[in-house]
Amino acid sequence: MATINQLVRKPRAKQVVKSNVPALEACPQKRGVCTRVYTTTPKKPNSALRKVCRVRLTNGFEVTSYIGGEGHNLQEHSVVLIRGGRVKDLPGVRYHTVRGALDCAGVNDRKQGRSKYGVKRPKS
């Protein structure tokens, strides 16, 4: 335990909290332009072709973003909205594209969990 005199001379160091999503710069979402749209394979033990895109953000960062849902309409030069949220089995992918915003369309024929995939309520 430090004495009061020691604490007066050199106070306790504050713990620095490191962000999981530095490119967002404390914003909820950021806009960016797709520079490359491609598929990649996950870590073991999973197997798939995960849809991802490389995005140049408005603040100059270039990040890799996951495209959730079945099927998408993104290509190079598409303008997308990025939110935080990593993909556990894709190393280096720390962002998600927001479906149903800007150039990224919602998922077709989605009935449940629609809000996560940018789908309006169906006419019943």
Swiss-Prot record:
GO terms for cellular component: small ribosomal subunit. SUPFAM superfamilies: Nucleic acid-binding proteins. GO terms for molecular function: rRNA binding; structural constituent of ribosome; tRNA binding. The modification 3-methylthioaspartic acid is found at residue 89. One of its GO terms (biological process) is translation. Belongs to the universal ribosomal protein uS12 family. Part of the 30S ribosomal subunit. Contacts proteins S8 and S17. May interact with IF1 in the 30S initiation complex. NCBIfam families: rpsL_bact. This is Small ribosomal subunit protein uS12. It comes from Vibrio campbellii (strain ATCC BAA-1116). The gene is rpsL.
